[in-house]
Design a protein with these regions (language model features):
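Feature of Fe-S/electron-transfer and energy-metabolism proteins
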Residues: 1-277
Length: 277
């Protein structure tokens, strides 16, 4: 049975076909090769011309964390995500843990920022959580301006629910009820997947008002960026979401104290959201 899944991360090698039972990966399969490929598989043979070297020593000791579900599940099917323990972490957090204990767990994990600076994620969460103010925001930075960099794109296209779940957990931890997913407009497939994932999560009661019957509510909205490299900087990103020109401003005050619409704001990259989950 043929099944469509999200990107496996080997974008330059596509189209890819993975045979689960045999653990074989085939690369650059064309339409013309479909018939001989199916014939070889039906005869329980390997289609040597396109057999990828996925079991090389380079990959042998690698363990997928952020891309754990990528290329395994259908990103448009919330049931498949749930079947792989999707949203279990969120439900555990909001029903069994206090906000401070969630922050402590992230701090103890040693997770750091994925934008280059390596700032401790848990410390950032703690700072926003302790900031005064009834209204706080969560922003997921899914924009990347480096030419040929598709890290965020592949993450959001292949496993959007994991990004959303990570945002919701962060929202609970810091006391926020609203999150923004900042995605560049040049990623139409990622935008499509994220918007569908948000609707499906709301339909299942895993996002929106009173999640899973608790007092915790969290809403997520997708905001499109114009592809400006400078909007990778936190304050420029905030200005863009607010509808202003994406220009950095002097700091302090830092976004954790005064960010989106002047309120305490937590900003993390999409990779952090998934690892934090």
């Amino acid at each position: 049975k043929a099944k469509g899944v999200g990107c496996k991360g080997l974008c330059s090698k596509g189209p890819l076909v993975n045979l689960d039972k045999k653990g074989e990966l085939y690369e650059a399969l064309t339409v013309d090769e479909a018939e001989p490929f199916v014939k070889a598989v039906s005869e329980k043979k390997s289609y040597e011309p396109r057999l990828a070297d996925a079991n090389s020593s380079f990959f042998a000791k690698q363990k997928k964390i952020v891309l754990e579900n990528s290329g395994v599940i259908d990103p448009e099917n919330i049931e498949e995500y749930i079947a792989r323990d999707g949203y279990v972490a969120l439900l555990k957090a909001i029903t069994e843990m206090s906000q401070s204990s969630v922050v402590d767990e992230v701090r103890n994990s040693g997770l750091r920022g994925r934008g280059g600076g390596g700032y401790p994620t848990g410390l950032k969460w703690q700072t926003v959580a302790k900031s005064s103010g009834a209204q706080k925001y969560v922003i997921c930075n899914g924009d990347e301006g480096d030419p040929g960099a598709f890290m965020d794109r592949s993450v959001m296209e292949a496993d959007p629910h994991r990004v959303i779940e990570g945002m919701a957990i962060a929202g609970y931890a810091i006391g926020a009820d609203t999150g923004y997913l900042y995605v560049r407009a040049e990623y139409p497939l990622a935008v499509k997947m994220l918007k569908k994932a948000i609707k499906d999560a709301e339909r299942c009661g895993l996002l929106g008002k009173n999640i899973a019957g608790t007092n915790f509510s969290f809403h997520v909205e997708v905001r499109l960026g114009a592809g400006a490299f400078v909007c990778g900087e936190e304050t420029a990103l905030i200005a863009s979401i607010e509808g202003r020109r994406g220009m950095p401003r002097p700091r302090p005050p830092f976004p954790a104290m005064k960010g989106l619409f002047g309120k305490p704001t937590l900003i993390n990259r999409s990779e952090e959201r998934r690892v934090g989950k």
